[in-house]
Each structure stands twice: as C-alpha cells, then as structure tokens.
Amino acid sequence: MITSTILVLLIPFVCTSLGAACVLFMKNELSVKTTKMLSGFAAGVMIAASVWSLLIPALEQSQSLGKMQFVPAVTGFMLGMFFLLILDTITPHMHLDNSVEGPKSNFSRQTMMVLAVTLHNIPEGMAVGVLYASWISGTTTITRAAALSLAIGIAIQNFPEGAIVSMPLHSTGSSKLRAFVYGVLSGIVEPIAGILTILAIGIIEPVMPYLLSFAAGAMIYVVIEELVPEMSEGGHSNRATIAFMVGFCLMMTLDVMLG
C-alpha cells in the first residue's frame, strides 16, 4: 500500500517534469494565446477538483453536525486562503507577467519565477495527500479511486504548467537545460507535501473535513491570484474560457467515473 501510494503521489511531479521537458524540444516559446489557454485549462481542473474532490467530501464528512455541517468546510476554506496569502506575502516571487511580490531580495528573476510556481504547487500536493490519508484512515467514505482521480487530474494540468514555467525561463536567458531543471524543481514540492500530509494521518484524522476544505481554499486562491489574471491578460479571448470549461468537465468526469 505504501509503495503504491508514493508512486501515485509522484504522478503529478512526473507530469510537471514532462511538461518542463518541452523546452528541450520546442524551438519557439509559447505564444500568448497558447499560454492563456493552458492557464484556463489548469484553472478549470483546479476549480473542479476543489469542489468535487475536496469541498463536497468535507461537507459529507460533517453531516453529523446537522445544519451546522458547513462550519468545517467554511473554516478550512478560509484558513487555506489565508495560508497561501501569508506565503505570498513573506516569500519573494515573480509572476509570469513579470510583476514582483513579497519582500525585497537579491534573488534572480528565474529563481523568483520558480518560487512563485513552487508556492502554488503546495496545495495541490496537500490535496492529493489529504485524500489518500482520508482513504488510508478507513473512517470516511473516500475511496482509493477518488484519491487516484484527483492525482490524475492534477497530473494532467501539471503537464502544461511545467511548460509554462520552463519556456519563459528559457526566453529570459536561461539555457534549455537550466530552464528544464528549474521547471522540474518547481514541481518537487507536490509529492513532498503529499507525503508529509499522509505521515501526519494520526494528527489530522479528527480534523479531516477542515483539511479537505483547507486544500480547496488554497487551490482556489491560486486560481484567482495566478491563473485568472494569466488567462485574462491582454485582449479578450474566448479560447481561455473554453479551455477552462474543458478542464472543469474533465476533472468532474474523472471524479465521478473513478470516485
């Protein structure tokens, strides 16, 4: 069980690495339209995962509270948002539009871009870890298939995310190999966050609904803070909106079919 769980936790990281490898084979950087579509797709997957795989199970696990079953979901959701907000505030990082956030530092542009993506990958790793911890505990209705569907959904959106990281790094002066390595490193935090969450199962089991919604709040914060501005940058485009819908439907389908 442990080996198979670790392997599943590595799937999103592997897909991030494969996406980052695009910089080794593609001659031209991603166009603005392509980047917007990929951001829209990733946003759709993350919103659907937050709702279907995290918030709904959090509400279901709180049914014993009756009409107050929303309390764990709302509390965890807001805590997840504040968690990412604090990380965004204390960590120097740079978004793809070259806007800098956080305290002043001597970090290079490349390092700050990687830090931005790394920060936003933490809730994705936590989300997969929380679902697997919930399944391993055996005290909830969450199945192994449900946890696997989330891991697959995150992995699918990680492929374009890896390319979105490595390609701009190369265009700003990094060598292809260096850009690839940075892209890979941006995703390594996901399996680490997932494994740490599972290892803490004895502590987190009593507060599982809070943690499920915590991961959802953190992921939706990433969507609003990072992906929505990227998919909306420049002129209006229906392509990014369509890509969002496709990503949402794909993740919803995975959750229903496998969960």
What are these model-derived regions, one by one?
Residues 1-259:
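Intrinsically disordered, metal-sensing/regulatory segments
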